[in-house]
Amino acid sequence: MTKQLTLFDIPSSKPAKSEQNTQQSQQSAPVEEKKVVRREWLEEAQENKIYFLLQVDYDGKKGKAVCKLFDKETQKIYALYDNTGHKPYFLVDLEPDKVGKIPKIVRDPSFDHIETVSKIDPYTWNKFKLTKIVVRDPLAVRRLRNDVPKAYEAHIKYFNNYMYDIGLIPGMPYVVKNGKLESVYLSLDEKDVEEIKKAFADSDEMTRQMAVDWLPIFETEIPKIKRVAIDIEVYTPVKGRIPDSQKAEFPIISIALAGSDGLKKVLVLNRNDVNEGSVKLDGISVERFNTEYELLGRFFDILLEYPIVLTFNGDDFDLPYIYFRALKLGYFPEEIPIDVAGKDEAKYLAGLHIDLYKFFFNKAVRNYAFEGKYNEYNLDAVAKALLGTSKVKVDTLISFLDVEKLIEYNFRDAEITLQLTTFNNDLTMKLIVLFSRISRLGIEELTRTEISTWVKNLYYWEHRKRNWLIPLKEEILAKSSNIRTSALIKGKGYKGAVVIDPPAGIFFNITVLDFASLYPSIIRTWNLSYETVDIQQCKKPYEVKDETGEVLHIVCMDRPGITAVITGLLRDFRVKIYKKKAKNPNNSEEQKLLYDVVQRAMKVFINATYGVFGAETFPLYAPAVAESVTALGRYVITSTVKKAREEGLTVLYGDTDSLFLLNPPKNSLENIIKWVKTTFNLDLEVDKTYKFVAFSGLKKNYFGVYQDGKVDIKGMLVKKRNTPEFVKKVFNEVKELMISINSPNDVKEIKRKIVDVVKGSYEKLKNKGYNLDELAFKVMLSKPLDAYKKNTPQHVKAALQLRPFGVNVLPRDIIYYVKVRSKDGVKPVQLAKVTEIDAEKYLEALRSTFEQILRAFGVSWDEIAATMSIDSFFSYPSKGNS
């Protein structure tokens, strides 16, 4: 796994320990000639056995789709190749004879045949004919789709297309019958059906039937899957050099394996250039090898005992490095259970490979499944946030560690990687399986893609189930591009949410009312979908009005829209069924934990729905739908604020889907909640209650303290991960002071103490009292250094300064830099001195953070500056409030 750059990642002035000693320990691969034939890494699935479908791939050598099936009894993955004759294809709106006259198509080596198919128009529900062009190779679809005026369903990966046509749902159980998969979903009892009918009583028939069809997805057992986490350490001759996984020029000195079955093993290369060391290894089994060739052979043998391999950044580093290193040592490709032919993906041929880095990097997973608990995406940061543990700290290059320290360091990384899937009763693995079921994506693709791909795949699957034609993006835009409002935010095509400006000050006894999943609820309630808004023929039109009463669009209520149905389905399942089941005392603890996982999985999809459908890059993006959602949101919020004020409630602040009320009477709260339900059929609920909230007067910017002393910080810069540590430390002092406020009588004294803390920080900054680590900004490199052409951000400028010293930085490395008085204005911490620090730039960091809090106390930054006699540092005008 690649390592985060630290203060130690700079070449030493003394000669590095000789690489020669390590290289001399490597023996060449056996010289006898080997005859290697293609190996089938997976056994074939057996007739009449039940398996869980985990992944569908395309085997290019056999020219078939292959289903990867997990047997929970043997804990192995088996292969089932398609025997239906299914082939890649795409659709065109041309007569078959016209297609037959296109030479590039019919003379293509992969062309198979043409047939006529019947599809349903999602806008009218009428049937019509299309021509299906069938080929023998998925790559031919990509090639031939450009030879027709319009190619439908030609941008879908073949293995996903296969799942749509066969109706497969990854993560679900199937039995093999005559070489085909037949579902063995659990049967519903009368109690289940009655619960569904009750929960979806106000829904249309399509939604009720879908609810019955979907219930097994959430209720079917999630199998425990044996898995092993691996991590490799590679010898490097100088500090700061990150090994290139494609060149694989340096030896692998150790490989750690941590298994869900209790395996704790490290394979170590014997070397004569390091000491043995004396570290307590806590039951870790160590195997030593004289040659790297033998070490890798043993590693492959162990790997084959597991159906799933876990890594953290294994797509980019661990697995490619192992593969190319094995080739260098004399292994044939057929002997290596790894394939790196795919773009940005490494496959484990004897099972599945899950790169947890990519899964945890998914913003929807971070924000909704794990409630934003981590802000950085490296292994150490994620582990600290979710597990409360961290990597082993070392103060020298990995290559120079004593053997036992290397073992401890290496194994901890593998152990943490495994624990990220086992904590909270296998929470992560259960989420992955449930996400796979909901999205209809195979586990490997799901863990490597963003939420937009998940949602797109679900909708495509549902289109195919209904035999609906999946429309082209340009066709949707042609029918739904009429935008009536102007965006207030640059880059947005239409007006967004309404925000009620907050006053500056500290207010006690604040209750927050929240519209439960407002945008998804609006989509469901108003039947919003690309095929229902602004369509030409409609018997039951409904006007979409904004907060001013202007009619923006017309929604057709003749038929349920697919977006409204699926969004409403997931929302109602979560709110009406699974949130309740997760808290039901009649359920066992194990059941409650499972139901909590189910509702978390639903939350990810529900909360991501509007963001995905409101993104111009999404293939089903309809501007009129996105504009309708935000317009109705503004209408609902402004109407509710008006009603609340009529009830005598004081609305201090409102943002998108929530209202902050000052000390509201209980009966008034109940009245407004009932009114919203009656008027809009939306759920308004008490979300939280604060002891007090400090508003800066800015939108999306406040500091709230709950009755139990916990805090809720929104919009303040200190929450950003690149905020220097010294600012965070000062902020924590201020935070503790804020928490101590219990009544309005405390405010004056706490204000004085906060001002003193901020002044003290300035004095320490002025006197060079902070070290470089405390002053460092931390920013992740998102792409190779050479890819920054037009603009060069500060962290890139700092990274470029490391090049002359032999330090190679790669995408996803964290760059630590400080602001200095120089042409570039920055330096990497490895090259900087405290005396070079530009104090004025750090004063700006202090100001931007604490000016917001001070505003709530009625203190402007100018007052702070004046009392410290530092006006000369601030040539720009004050932005603070008096």
Curated annotation (Swiss-Prot):
Protein name as catalogued: DNA polymerase 1
Enzyme class: transferase
Assembly and oligomerization: Interacts with PCNA subunit PCNA2 and weakly with PCNA3.
Ranges of Polar residues composition bias in the record: 18-29
E.C. no: 2.7.7.7
GO function terms (MF aspect): DNA binding; DNA-directed DNA polymerase activity; exonuclease activity; nucleotide binding
Stored SMART domains: POLBc (SM00486)
Reaction(s) catalysed (UniProt annotation): DNA(n) + a 2'-deoxyribonucleoside 5'-triphosphate = DNA(n+1) + diphosphate
Protein family membership: Belongs to the DNA polymerase type-B family.
Domain of life: Archaea
Protein role: This polymerase possesses two enzymatic activities: DNA synthesis (polymerase) and an exonucleolytic activity that degrades single-stranded DNA in the 3'- to 5'-direction. DNA polymerase I, DNA ligase and the flap endonuclease may be constitutively associated with the PCNA heterotrimer forming a scanning complex able to couple DNA synthesis and Okazaki fragment maturation.
Activity regulation, free text: DNA synthesis is stimulated by PCNA heterotrimers.
Keyword Cell inner membrane: no
One biological process term in Gene Ontology: DNA-templated DNA replication
Species this chain originates from: Saccharolobus solfataricus (strain ATCC 35092 / DSM 1617 / JCM 11322 / P2)
SUPFAM superfamilies with a match to the protein in the record: DNA/RNA polymerases (SSF56672), Ribonuclease H-like (SSF53098)
InterPro entries, A to Z: DNA-dir_DNA_pol_B, DNA-dir_DNA_pol_B_CS, DNA-dir_DNA_pol_B_exonuc, DNA-dir_DNA_pol_B_multi_dom, DNA/RNA_pol_sf, DNA_pol_palm_dom_sf, DNA_pol_type-B, RNaseH-like_sf
Keywords: DNA replication, DNA-binding, DNA-directed DNA polymerase, Exonuclease, Hydrolase, Nuclease, Nucleotidyltransferase, Transferase
Location of the region described as Disordered in the Swiss-Prot/TrEMBL record: 1-31
Pfam families: DNA_pol_B (PF00136), DNA_pol_B_exo1 (PF03104)
